[in-house]
């Protein structure tokens, strides 16, 4: 956390035609920055039954992170620099973990062992950089906003896609236009057929950008007849509400193992019960950047047309490299459901009897085959996104995959076979 100067080359040339080196304004640093403190309270119970064959463990914890280093509250742009980070944040996380295990060997020699666990936790910001700001004026876009649950996603609740029958048509077969008054300004939009129309003119320009059949229709939560983001504050969220949370919830795992007369088998499951994100990039957002030409098959086969009115995705549109815009505002319908169940490993092995090995001076030999990450069950509607690795990264900071959902290195599937020998 030292104040540094960013270096680079200006657009000015010296007498030899070379670009002149330059240094940027030094970053601001809080002179009183210090270590953050973590306090943890934990209660646990560990029980064993049936001659130690069955066990249950339960833990409940509360973790307080105090004086956490987070960005300061936004300062006027006339300052000329970003607000410095400092010890402005405090979090409280509450969670629990339950695990159980069982092992037994039957009289016929069959042995089984089972382990399972599930855990959950949620975090609330007890103090953010905006703690002095009145509650009603705190921005919905602030990650560490005082009193808010960490990871909450604010957006619109999607009703459905507009259909042709939602609009009024003239004698020429074209949708009729009308003038509505929005925030004291006359706005041109398409006339709706509903007795109680809800207009979305906040995101229209009255010309090319007008909500039409195939575009997303949002729910008017505040009942004023318009879809708006308000001031995007706690006190005036408009029609925005919490539509999801990025924190993984209900993380679970399950392992089953068995062995019998030299054969052994194990299978390991892992998953997350609940998690939502608003994606970024061509794999997550339909129409993200049409000029790139790269998009999943799911988008090309399930977008709205007059012949496919029950499609999941809206009519084709080019967002010009943005993950929000026009009909593709942050909304419940197109949040990515990152819950999943993955079979992480399946192993089958056979241990050769020792009476056979003794003849060739080997004390133990085992052959095995193992499958890694071969089977995944998710709710991503066929999108090629790994729910365990969601963010892309580019070493060149290019616009192709920097921060884009699903474009990072995926979890690889692998099949391996081997022989383990002990002499």
Where do the protein language model's features map onto the residues?
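Conserved small-residue
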Residues: 1, 9-10, 103-242, 305, ...
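Extracellular/periplasmic, surface-exposed regions of secreted and cell-surface proteins
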Residues: 1-153, 330-423
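Extracellular/surface-associated beta-sandwich interaction domains
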Residues: 33, 96, 137, 155-156, ...
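Small-side-chain secondary-structure face that scaffolds active or pore-lining regions
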Residues: 56, 60-94, 111, 218-220, ...
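C-terminal extracellular loops and terminal segments
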Residues: 83-92, 134-150, 237, 243-253, ...
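Extracytoplasmic gating/loop element in the C-terminal half of outer-membrane beta-barrel translocons
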Residues: 209-211, 235, 272-366, 371-372
